[in-house]
């Protein structure tokens, strides 16, 4: 269950312009982590565009940009620790692209994708403990490939014999029957087969 914490933007490890180290792994080992959000990455998130689009409602809630950073093409730098421990610190350029009205993580993202071997369908999750930010990923569940499926056995189906449109007995009596849209229409023997339609 997620811990609800009163939060202000100054608690984030946001650094304007990319200076400073930030996000080191020291101290606060007993801090409780608050789950923020996760995203199933798309082909464009892990492809040659080298960027992760952060869903707008999560970006504005958890990584708000001040007016100066929002209008600056440089944005800011977010520093994340690896949620699984170790000494890995991930520094990402985070900015708002007004052209597409989206929040994106750019510089540093391609390294994370490569190091974690992310593929479309994998999930990236974000959490925090106080002012420390954490990132984690998990692979999508292995799907059953069509090559691993066993072909089904051939099944023989015995269909009932089809019913002729004109019954032999009715044909012998001189009556004709026409089946139209599942309805049997009885035709008179003296009726002309041609229809005289006047429009």
Swiss-Prot record:
It comes from Oryza sativa subsp. japonica. SUPFAM superfamilies: DNA-binding pseudobarrel domain (SSF101936). Residues 13-32 are annotated as: Disordered. PROSITE patterns: B3 (PS50863). It comes from the Eukaryota. One of its GO terms (molecular function) is DNA binding. Residues 37-141 bind DNA. This is B3 domain-containing protein Os06g0107800. GO terms for cellular component: nucleus.
């Amino acid at each position: 269950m997620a811990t609800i914490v009163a939060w202000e933007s100054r608690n984030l490890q946001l650094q304007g312009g990319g200076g400073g180290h930030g996000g080191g792994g020291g101290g606060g080992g007993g801090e409780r982590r608050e789950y923020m959000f996760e995203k199933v990455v798309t082909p464009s998130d892990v492809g040659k565009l080298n960027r992760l689009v952060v869903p707008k409602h999560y970006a504005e809630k958890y990584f708000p940009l001040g007016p100066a950073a929002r209008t600056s093409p440089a944005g800011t730098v977010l520093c994340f620790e690896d949620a699984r421990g170790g000494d890995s610190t991930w520094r990402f350029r985070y900015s708002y692209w007004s052209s597409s009205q989206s929040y994106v993580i750019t510089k540093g993202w391609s390294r994370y994708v490569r190091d974690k071997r992310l593929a479309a369908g994998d999930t990236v999750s974000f959490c925090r403990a106080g002012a420390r930010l954490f990132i984690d990923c998990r692979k999508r569940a292995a799907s059953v490939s069509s090559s691993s499926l066993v072909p089904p056995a051939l099944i023989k189906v015995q269909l009932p014999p089809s019913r002729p449109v004109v019954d032999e007995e009715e044909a012998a009596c001189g009556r004709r029957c026409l089946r139209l849209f599942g309805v049997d229409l009885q035709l008179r023997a003296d009726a002309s087969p041609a229809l005289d339609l006047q429009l």
